Amino acid sequence: MSKNHPASSLQIKTPRLKLIPCPLDVAEASIFNPSLVAEILGAGVPKDWQKTEVQDFLPMYAQMLVDDPTSLGWGVWLMIQTQENTLIGDLGFGGKPDESGSLEIGYEVFAAYRNQGYGFEAVQALVNWAFSHPELKRLIAHCPIDNLASVRILEKLGMERLHLVEVPELPNTQVWKWQLRDLQIKK
């Protein structure tokens, strides 16, 4: 991705990662011509990225960016491992904070890169970025009760586990609802 690309100015760098808000051209390429994604990003893209959960969200996300270009940063972020210059996961939000200042975060690290601390490193950096915006008051996460790696990430972030929630799309499935308020963030 060129330095003149709109998403370049929002990059977040951590010791091992570069987080980039997914630009419209990458979202559209992923939907319509996946072979172009690596070229646009200037990074390696695993073939199994097309099978990740974020793919279902990309059409809605692309439309969100078309309707409101200032939404860049409040949707999908791409997690690039800098040493290999490879996409290793994605994370992000479902849009800008709502009227009450709440926002939901989600994340996924590809299987080959799990249990190496990348998830926490990325989520912590994105949480810090999000809470640098005064309109954000509360961050929400939903996590399957058996996803111990994600539970550890949420606990390390200082998120508070609230209660179990039913998943309407998946009968007999429950997830934990978590929250982090701006007052809990060390500034």
Where are these regions (language model features)?
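Glycine-rich acyl-CoA binding loop
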Residues: 117-120
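Conserved active-site tyrosine of GNAT-family acetyltransferases
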Residues: 154
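A generic structural-conservation signal
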Residues: 122, 139-140, 163
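GNAT-family acyltransferases
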Residues: 1-104, 109-112, 125-129, 133, ...
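Conserved beta-strand-loop-alpha-helix junction that forms the acyl-donor binding cleft
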Residues: 141-151
